[in-house]
Amino acid sequence: NGLDQAGIAFVGTSETQEVDLQSLGDAAVGLETGYFYSAAHESAANDAFKAKLKELYPNAEPNPATVSAFDGTHALYQMIGATGGKKDPDAAIAAIKGASWESPRGPISIDAGTRDIVQNVYIRKVEKDADGRLFNREYKTYETQPDYGVQK
């Protein structure tokens, strides 16, 4: 598209998620984005998540939606466990306020005041591996980022 030759840097968020990355082709090489999840995130939790996803759904690609569903389900299990399966909204909310765990996306927590997620944001750059496949290489982490759209 010529933007890079004109000195215009592309800044984005999830535009280079792995589910779309190969279809972008070589024009994507060098693009830098910041987001809370990339399938290329290196961690034991992400490796286990990707392996289980592949086992259950061989054609599925790990992406922000699948990891968000995974974490939402984890939160629900915590809430159900705290209530013993009984209808107790106060106990359910109390169980998750301030909770933290190791997600496939990295460490996350639920802000006790806003009940919104606090998570890392990874700055990554699209590169090509030895087989010519595009991937996001994380090179900087902004840890424990709140939802800046929420007012306390």
What are these regions (language model features)?
Residues 1-152:
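Extracytosolic ligand-binding ectodomains
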